């Protein structure tokens, strides 16, 4: 890696991690398509997932080392802020497409669906049971991670941030496990009409984002334990909080629209 002493930014050296992450994401996408067409693809998806995790870990490790060396100036951190904001905006557009699909079919059901929504034969989940508990988990986790951030800004590096992060990680993990339990007990699958397809795509991709956010929180917890954050320099943790709040907002919208409003209850 080279750095020009007269430049506000550094120029990273060649890195293989973006290439491996792209290949892994492509492999997981192909595996998902094959699985939806009832073609065995667990080996491809498993290998792609392992490669994705290892590549992401290595990429984050190099990025953290660059910051520890001193390459992350305030101009670089500002560019990171802009990039994370644009990344979250792209994620908003990603979920917007699925919500659009849901509204297109819910507001104007086709003849194939019996002009009804939910379609006949679909027993939708009760919004006041499991999903309400999941909503409480994510809202509580958002409050705890915000309190952890507030404690860090007040130069409390001992109790406040640790408790907030640990509780948030536990809430995210429990949310994912409860979501899997709900999938197990649902009376319909992803192949049962457009409702099943959109429901599992929305909740499934949101669950994947919960997993990513939980891993990011774990990385932030380890970095906090190693003393890599300060009250002024902790953008990695701050970006994680942005992402987690985005996950919270998406779930609240999903619960209100999919479970409550158009859930048939």
Swiss-Prot record:
> What sort of enzyme, by top EC class, is this?
translocase
How is it placed in the membrane, per its record?
Multi-pass membrane protein
EC number in record: 7.1.1.9
Gene3D superfamilies associated with the record = 1.10.287.70, Cytochrome c oxidase, subunit III, four-helix bundle
Question: What are its GO cellular component terms?
Answer: mitochondrial inner membrane
Q: GO MF terms on file?
A: cytochrome-c oxidase activity
Signal peptide positions on this chain: none
One GO BP: aerobic electron transport chain
- According to its UniProt record, which reaction does this protein catalyse? 4 Fe(II)-[cytochrome c] + O2 + 8 H(+)(in) = 4 Fe(III)-[cytochrome c] + 2 H2O + 4 H(+)(out)
Question: Where is this protein found?
Answer: Mitochondrion inner membrane
Q: Which UniProt keywords apply?
A: Membrane, Mitochondrion, Mitochondrion inner membrane, Translocase, Transmembrane, Transmembrane helix
A Pfam family that the UniProt record links to this protein: COX3
Write out the transmembrane intervals: 16-36, 40-60, 83-103, 159-179, 198-218, 241-261
Q: Which protein family is named in the record?
A: Belongs to the cytochrome c oxidase subunit 3 family.
Which PANTHER family does the record cross-reference, listed alphabetically? CYTOCHROME C OXIDASE SUBUNIT 3, CYTOCHROME C OXIDASE SUBUNIT III
Q: What does this protein do?
A: Component of the cytochrome c oxidase, the last enzyme in the mitochondrial electron transport chain which drives oxidative phosphorylation. The respiratory chain contains 3 multisubunit complexes succinate dehydrogenase (complex II, CII), ubiquinol-cytochrome c oxidoreductase (cytochrome b-c1 complex, complex III, CIII) and cytochrome c oxidase (complex IV, CIV), that cooperate to transfer electrons derived from NADH and succinate to molecular oxygen, creating an electrochemical gradient over the inner membrane that drives transmembrane transport and the ATP synthase.
Q: What is this protein called?
A: Cytochrome c oxidase subunit 3
Source organism (scientific name)? Mytilus edulis (Blue mussel)
């Amino acid at each position: 890696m080279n750095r020009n002493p007269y430049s506000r930014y550094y120029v990273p050296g060649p890195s293989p991690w973006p290439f491996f992450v792209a290949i892994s994401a492509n492999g997981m996408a192909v595996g998902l398509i094959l699985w939806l067409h009832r073609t065995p693809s667990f080996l491809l998806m498993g290998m792609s997932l392992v490669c994705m995790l290892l590549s992401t870990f290595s990429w984050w490790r190099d990025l953290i080392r660059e910051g520890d060396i001193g390459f992350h100036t305030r101009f670089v951190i500002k560019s990171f802020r802009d990039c994370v904001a644009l990344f979250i905006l792209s994620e908003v557009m990603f979920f917007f497409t699925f919500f659009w699909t849901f509204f297109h079919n819910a507001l104007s059901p086709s003849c194939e669906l019996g002009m009804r929504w939910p379609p006949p034969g679909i027993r939708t989940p009760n919004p006041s049971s499991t999903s309400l508990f999941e909503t409480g988990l994510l809202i509580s986790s958002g409050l705890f991670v915000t309190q952890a951030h507030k404690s860090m800004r007040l130069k409390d590096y001992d109790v406040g941030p640790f408790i907030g992060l640990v509780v948030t990680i536990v809430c995210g993990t429990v949310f994912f496990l409860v979501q899997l339990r709900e999938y197990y007990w649902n009376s319909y699958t992803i192949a049962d009409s457009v409702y099943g397809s959109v429901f599992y795509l929305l909740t499934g991709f949101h669950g994947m984002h919960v997993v990513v956010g939980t891993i990011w929180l774990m990385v932030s917890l380890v970095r906090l334990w190693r003393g890599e954050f300060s009250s002024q320099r902790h953008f990695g943790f701050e970006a994680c909080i942005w992402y987690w709040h985005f996950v919270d907002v998406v779930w609240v919208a999903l619960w209100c629209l999919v479970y409550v409003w158009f859930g048939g209850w």
